[in-house]
Amino acid sequence: MARSGKISSITSLTLFADAIGSKNLKKAIKVLNRTKVSAITDFTIPLLRAWTMVAMGDYKKAISALEPLTRIQGFEPMRLHHIALIEDFKGNKIVADQAYIRALDKSKSIRTLQAYGRFLERSGRRAEAYNLYTKYQTRQGLENQMKEEIFKFDTGLQRSGMIRTSSEGIAEVMFNLAGTLT
């Protein structure tokens, strides 16, 4: 821990994971509040705070927690992706649909494409889901993932949302962090 009382980013992520694992959400928020600002924490802290707010059942604060991402160049698609995931998780179909569309307008992220396709399938809009998958099937870098989505689509099985628990939302943040660092 630094003399300022702030926690380094790696230590912070470890303490946060421990607090979340023990379902101590208030402690998790305290850890986030004490984390030193860095290139990594600039975007991870708002995302982790948002999903912790989801775990607390405060969806309004969850969406508000994502606001700092608007000030980081290039992170608007990620902010919209998480808004869509949160609204989808909450069951707010209209807002989720709009957020998915806005996120895809900004960036054709494979995670957003997959999440939106599943959303469309669950919403009974199978033709739209299929069109989404096939539209991006030939895009460089997306071929394998879209083929997998089409294969799953063709099975006709009921698809779950990408995020089924707030813990999965936090895991999505870690997945996004890994993708950003590579």
Language model features by range: what are they?
Residues 1-182:
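Alpha-solenoid helical repeat scaffolds
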